[in-house]
Swiss-Prot record:
It comes from Methanoregula boonei (strain DSM 21154 / JCM 14090 / 6A8). This is GMP synthase [glutamine-hydrolyzing] subunit B. InterPro entries: GMP_synth_C, GMP_synthase_B, GMPS_ATP_PPase_dom, NAD/GMP_synthase, Rossmann-like_a/b/a_fold. Residues 2-184 form the GMPS ATP-PPase domain. CDD domains: GMP_synthase_C (cd01997). SUPFAM superfamilies: Adenine nucleotide alpha hydrolases-like (SSF52402), GMP synthetase C-terminal dimerisation domain (SSF54810). NCBIfam families: guaA_Cterm. The lineage of its organism: Archaea, Methanobacteriati, Methanobacteriota, Stenosarchaea group, Methanomicrobia. The gene is guaAB. One of its GO terms (cellular component) is cytosol. It comes from the Archaea.
Length: 305
């Protein structure tokens, strides 16, 4: 458990020291990690903070609209970079290379936006599990191992780098952030790209975006998982009507966890799983098969890539 008031005071002082008199751009995704960072930085440097939301084209259904609505009261800059990210991922199938391509593109977009405002520092919501998995070679997170070696920023500020996810939520509560942010399900920085095995294309993104929305709509309110989602894991043979199809295989995953370091699969009644599978195959014609992932972490990671 983190001593929230002491942590908040220390973090504000750290941001002030690191930023000096410089302007700071920050990556605001709308999740609890980046929202806590935004709140801390706003206290520390006021209007020298420039929050930026990058629409990568890899976001969940309605995500960008939700961000605009929730953070409409601050000077949030929204950057549409979807075509850039899809182009950067073209032809890449290796998960590590995908994460590094996304990390590189994030930094280049932030550098471009920072240049417009004269900002020289970048602030981001890296947390301790990101560092453990990246440094331990499990998988590179876009904001740690996936970042390019050289950037135009004088400093990268990471005020919550030593916190676990449950500790970040405690700090969010102490900062007075609304429950919808404090308890929001994690969503990976690389977005739906890490829920697509193999090359990322606009067609695949459209399929998994809809499947993910169906999975969340069926599971979140009823079961309150730590995280749930759908992933596109390959192609398989199916039958629709009297016709054979070669369609997508979608895996649904729902887990409970405390800090994201370990996780257990959610025990969803079979009837509900059947309904989820039926909805996905009926509402997305190109999907031929739906499976439910019962693997804990470890041995699996929560996300597929």
């Amino acid at each position: 458990m983190v001593k929230t008031e002491k942590f908040i005071q220390k973090s504000v002082e750290e941001i002030q020291k690191e930023a000096g008199n410089e302007k700071v751009v920050m990556a605001l995704s709308g999740g609890v990690d980046s929202s806590v960072c935004a709140s801390l930085a706003a206290r520390a440097i006021g209007d020298r903070l420039i929050p930026i939301y990058i629409d990568t084209g890899l976001m969940r259904k309605g995500e960008t609209e939700r961000i605009k609505a929730v953070f409409g009261n601050i000077r949030l800059q929204v950057v549409d970079a979807g075509d850039e990210f899809v182009a950067a991922l073209a032809g890449i199938t290796d998960p590590e290379k995908k994460r590094k391509a996304i990390g590189e593109r994030f930094i280049r977009v932030f550098e471009r936006e920072a240049k417009k405002s004269g900002a020289t520092c970048l602030l981001q919501g890296t947390i301790y599990p990101d560092r453990i998995e990246s440094e331990g070679g499990i998988k590179s997170h876009h904001n740690v191992g996936g970042m390019p070696e050289h950037t135009a920023f004088k400093k990268v500020i990471e005020p919550i780098r030593d916190l676990y996810k449950d500790e970040v939520r405690e700090v969010a509560g102490a900062l007075g952030l609304p429950p919808e942010i404090q308890h929001r399900m994690p969503f990976p920085g690389p977005g739906l790209a890490v829920r697509i095995l193999g090359e990322v294309t606009k067609e695949k993104v459209a399929v998994i975006r809809e499947a993910n929305w169906i999975a969340e709509s069926e599971i979140v309110e009823k079961y309150r998982p730590w995280q749930c989602f759908a992933a596109l894991i390959g192609l398989g043979t199916g039958v629709k009507g009297d016709n054979r199809i070669h369609g997508w295989i979608v895996a649904v995953r729902a887990v409970n966890s405390r800090d994201g370091m370990t996780a257990d699969p959610l025990e969803i009644p079979f009837a509900d799983l059947v309904r989820i599978g039926s909805r996905i195959t009926a509402e997305i014609p190109s999907v031929a098969r739906v499976v439910y992932d019962i693997t804990p972490k470890p041995p699996a990671t929560i996300e597929y890539e």
